[in-house]
Amino acid sequence: RKETAGTIVVDSDARYLYYVLPEGKAIRYGITVGEDALAFSGLAKVGRKEEWPSWTPTNDIKKRLGNIPAYVAPGPHNPMGSRALYVYEGNRDTLYRIHGTNQPEYIGSAISSGCIRLTNEDAIDLFNRVKVGSMVVVLAPGQGDSPSNPRVAFTGGRDVN
């Protein structure tokens, strides 16, 4: 499928997020993705945006990670980082986020609880470009443009081999 300008495409396999520009161009950002069992894939939209978000871990995250605070205020110690895009399916909050991070050393890894993390600088740049209602396409494992599955997201998934 060919995505329209303003769409976010997440290629979890390659660990990149693309913000689609006019004329078939895109801005590419390095990302941290969710562990396979925790990752989101499919079509969604940006339901809301927040600068310096707070973080309230879900019960599942509390069980999985153990001793973590029930709430983290905005700021440099908040794992949500500088900006957050809230991913919705229809009018339902999926609880998945595209957000900054206070751990930029993990960009390129698959260690999150499902969210897509960017450096804080990249999160600010993306936040300033994206509108509420923008389409979010998260490619399923094996559907991205990685060495193990060389497909191209912007040309309808045609093989490049």
Report each predicted region and the residues it spans:
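Exported/periplasmic cell-wall-interacting domains
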Residues: 3, 28, 37-38, 42-43, ...
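Cell wall/extracellular polymer interaction/catalysis modules
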Residues: 1-60
